[in-house]
Design a protein with these regions (language model features):
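Short amphipathic alpha-helices and their capping/turn segments at secondary-structure boundaries
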Residues: 11-30, 59-69, 95-106, 162-175, ...
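Hydrophobic faces of well-ordered beta-strands that scaffold small-molecule active sites
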Residues: 3-7, 30-35, 75-77, 112-114, ...
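Active-site acidic/histidine proton-transfer and metal-coordination neighborhood
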Residues: 46-148
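A short small-residue
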Residues: 39-44, 74-82, 192-194, 232-234
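Histidine-acidic metal/acid-base catalytic patches
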Residues: 71-73, 134-148, 157-263
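N-terminal pre-domain/capping segments
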Residues: 1-62, 68, 144-146, 248-263
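Short, glycine/charged-enriched secondary-structure capping and boundary segments
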Residues: 19-23, 46, 89-92, 127-129, ...
C-alpha cells in the first residue's frame, strides 16, 4: 500500500543502522521529517537571538547528514514561534537559516522543505498562512532551487484557509504533500494541531474534504506518474485508540476519496 515513508531522528547508531538496512531492502521513497528535532528541544530557526538560531541550524544540518545516510533526498522542517514586534527580524533570521541549509544540502543534491503551519492556534509558527508562505518561498527561490514547501490538509482549518486557496497560491513552490485532520473548535477534545483520525468528533476533515484536496491537486496538474510527489498520511492516536484500526480508517478514507475524484 505504501510507496513512501517519513522518518525522523534515530536514537543511536544501532537503531540508525537497523533502519538503514530495512529501508535499503524496501523499495520505498524515503523522506526525513526534522520537525521533532526542533519541537522537542524547543529550538527556533527564526530565533532573533543568534545563539538560539544557530542551535536550530546546527541540528538541522545534522538532520541533513542523517537523512542522507538513511537514503532520503532531503529534509522537512518548520518555522518557530514569533512575536508581532519582531516579525520582520524573525523573517530575516529564517531566511538566513534556510539559505544555509540549502547551501549545505545542495552539495549533496538534496532538498530542503519548509512545512506550512498555523500562525496563531497551536504551533503558532512564523510561516503560514499561505500568502506569507508564498512570499517566503519566492524569496528563497531567488537564491536556491533546492527549496520547496510542504503543505498539509490538516493545517488548512488551523489557518482558516481552503484547499483551493492554499494550493493555487503556493502552486509554484509545493514539493511535498500531507493529509490529515484537525479539531478547530475550542474546548473540544484534540483541539489544535493534534492530527486525530479522519472523521474524529467535531473535527474539520473527512472524506469530503479529502476529495476537495485531491480534486484541486488534480486540477492544478500535481499528479505526475513519471515523477510523483509524496502524499503522506499524518494521523495520530487519541486516548486509547488502536493504531491498526486508525491506520485502516485512514486507508479507507483515502481509498473512498480517491474513488470519488472525477476523471
Amino acid at each position: 500500500y505504501f510507496d513512501a515513508i517519513e522518518i525522523t531522528e534515530c536514537t543511536d547508531d544501532e537503531e540508525r543502522n537497523a533502519v538503514k538496512k530495512i529501508l535499503e531492502q524496501s523499495h520505498m521513497k524515503v523522506c526525513y521529517g526534522a520537525q521533532p528535532r526542533l519541537l522537542g528541544p524547543k529550538l527556533n530557526p527564526n530565533d532573533i537571538d543568534e545563539k538560539g538560531r544557530k542551535a536550530a541550524e546546527n541540528t538541522l544540518l545534522e538532520a541533513i547528514d542523517e537523512a542522507e545516510y538513511l537514503g532520503a533526498k532531503g529534509i522537512a522542517f518548520l518555522a518557530g514561534k514569533w512575536e508581532e514586534k519582531t516579525k520582520e527580524q524573525a523573517y530575516e533570521q529564517l531566511l538566513k537559516t534556510t539559505r544555509n541549509l540549502c547551501d549545505y544540502a545542495a552539495k549533496k543534491d538534496m532538498m530542503v522543505e519548509l512545512e506550512v503551519f498555523d500562525f496563531d492556534m497551536d504551533k503558532a509558527a512564523l510561516i503560514g498562512p499561505a500568502p506569507y508562505a508564498a512570499k517566503f518561498a519566492a524569496d528563497m527561490r531567488t537564491t536556491h532551487n533546492n527549496f520547496g514547501l510542504l503543505v498539509d490538509l490538516s493545517h488548512f482549518p488551523t489557518t482558516y484557509e481552503t484547499s483551493k486557496f492554499v494550493i493555487q497560491i503556493l502552486k509554484p513552490y509545493i514539493t511535498h504533500l500531507h493529509f490529515g485532520n484537525a479539531v478547530v473548535k475550542k474546548g473540544c477534545q484534540a483541539y489544535g494541531d493534534k492530527h486525530p483520525r479522519m472523521g474524529y468528533p467535531e473535527s474539520a476533515n473527512d472524506v469530503k474534504e479529502l476529495v476537495e484536496y485531491l480534486t484541486v491537486l488534480k486540477e492544478e496538474n500535481f499528479f505526475n506518474s513519471e515523477e510523483p510527489l509524496v502524499l503522506s498520511m499524518e494521523v495520530t492516536l487519541i486516548g486509547d485508540e488502536d493504531e491498526e484500526i486508525v491506520l485502516a480508517n485512514t486507508k479507507r478514507v483515502l481509498n473512498r476519496a480517491w474513488a470519488l475524484v472525477e476523471d
